[in-house]
């Protein structure tokens, strides 16, 4: 320990209080007062950021802990008539989305703690119907609220296979990110079933289909340039919002992009934040390789430690872009053992002048997007903002010359 540090520590415990000690004492007093009294602020006072009491355990973005003037969650002018679970009783767009909620993130006091999770008898509150989908960590079922007759989606996490900390993390990321118009709405409240078999939380129901189902319905023809631009305008807006909060989705794929109107693709939302982590977080790699994984992930061994980086989302977006346009994937795995990917990498490195045939229909601007998203050098990849600018006005496919008949 340096002499200056020794002197500072001595002053903190033996001598007069230093500036650092007074600041720490003040912050502790603020936290204690909040936990003991919970006094509501005057409605005329402006919102102030509160101390991050749960940052080390939950690791949330800073803006996720902003509060409104009454220390309650701003909930988009929703009416909460349900007895146990706060789900909106009205379904109009004006009531479901408010300007205040979409422009800011707020949180109700205590919702980021590891308090005991409330038990709820699902049969008393909901009529649970068919299963909508399943994933690595849980499954989703369609349900109808008995009082309001509103359809919602319930995401279940089997308790034997789920740690409470993992469930709380996913709920909080889902809840805090849902103010964005292109991210699935998650309603307030973490619960567990009365028989202790599962944790669950409630989200809005998508009546149409996922992007995967929409593309498969085209019989490998793709959804077209116009619809692809609409989808990516929404998805890139959501991912750019997450990246601005230093959060990485880490599981972007067509199944996790929901299409609420399959006719014009006017309403698109991103879902599933089970693997979401903060930038620079260290995680263990799991044996789970899919078409969307970046090259650096495909060469990783099981349980190897990785540092979370935004560039993995950018790679996945490049794959999704190709999938929307062509109706199929460019390759099965981003490894040199996979010939289609090896050909792409050889062209990127200029070792082969011939562009892979799969990419021939794309324009120069679209090829630039691929080069800046599907490059094995993750530091050279674009940001979500760069991709959004490229897709805004540029043509994605080459112009096809129509032969003029000769008379």
Swiss-Prot record:
Molecular functions (GO terms): ATP binding; protein serine kinase activity; protein serine/threonine kinase activity
GO cellular component annotations of the record: cytoplasm
EC number, as in UniProt: 2.7.11.1
Database matches in InterPro entries: Kinase-like_dom_sf, Prot_kinase_dom, Protein_kinase_ATP_BS
Keywords, sorted A to Z: ATP-binding, Kinase, Nucleotide-binding, Serine/threonine-protein kinase, Transferase
Region (Disordered): 33-68
Residues annotated as the enzyme's active site: 251
PANTHER family, A to Z: INHIBITOR OF NUCLEAR FACTOR KAPPA-B KINASE EPSILON SUBUNIT HOMOLOG 1-RELATED, SERINE/THREONINE-PROTEIN KINASE SBK1
Protein name: Putative serine/threonine-protein kinase C01C4.3
Organism: Caenorhabditis elegans
């Amino acid at each position: 320990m340096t002499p200056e540090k020794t002197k500072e520590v001595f002053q903190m415990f033996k001598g007069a209080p230093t500036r650092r000690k007074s600041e720490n004492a003040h912050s502790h007093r603020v936290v204690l007062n909040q936990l003991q009294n919970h006094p509501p602020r005057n409605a005329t006072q402006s919102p102030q950021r509160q101390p991050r009491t749960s940052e080390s355990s939950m690791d949330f973005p800073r803006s996720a802990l902003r509060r409104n003037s009454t220390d309650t969650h701003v909930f988009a002018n929703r009416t909460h008539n349900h007895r146990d679970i706060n789900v909106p009783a009205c379904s109009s767009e004006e009531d479901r989305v408010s300007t205040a909620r979409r422009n800011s993130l707020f949180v109700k006091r205590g919702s980021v703690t590891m308090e005991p999770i409330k038990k709820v008898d699902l049969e008393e509150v909901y009529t649970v119907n068919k299963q909508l989908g399943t994933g690595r960590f849980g499954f989703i079922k369609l349900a109808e609220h008995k009082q309001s007759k509103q359809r919602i989606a319930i995401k279940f996490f089997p308790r034997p296979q789920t740690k409470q900390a993992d469930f709380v993390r996913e709920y909080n990321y889902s809840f805090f990110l849902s103010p964005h118009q292109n991210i699935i709405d998650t309603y307030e409240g973490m619960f567990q079933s009365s028989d202790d078999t599962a944790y669950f939380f409630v989200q809005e129901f998508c009546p149409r289909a996922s992007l995967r189902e929409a593309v498969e319905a085209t019989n490998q023809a793709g959804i077209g340039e116009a619809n692809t631009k609409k989808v990516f305008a929404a998805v890139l807006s959501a991912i750019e919002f997450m990246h601005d909060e230093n959060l990485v989705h880490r599981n972007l794929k067509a199944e996790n992009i929901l299409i609420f109107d399959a006719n014009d693709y006017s309403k698109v939302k991103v879902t599933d934040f089970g693997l979401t982590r903060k930038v620079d977080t260290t995680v263990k790699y799991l044996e789970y390789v899919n078409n969307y994984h970046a090259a650096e992930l495909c060469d990783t061994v099981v349980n190897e430690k990785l540092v979370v980086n935004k560039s993995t989302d950018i790679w996945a977006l490049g794959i999704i872009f190709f999938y929307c346009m062509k109706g199929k994937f460019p390759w099965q795995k981003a490894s040199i053992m996979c010939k289609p990917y090896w050909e792409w990498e050889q062209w990127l490195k200029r070792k082969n002048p011939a562009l892979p045939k799969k990419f021939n229909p794309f324009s120069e601007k679209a090829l630039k997007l691929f080069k800046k998203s599907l490059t094995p050098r993750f530091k050279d990849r674009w940001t979500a903002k760069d991709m959004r600018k490229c897709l805004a006005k540029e043509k994605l496919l080459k112009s096809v010359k129509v032969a003029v008949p000769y008379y």
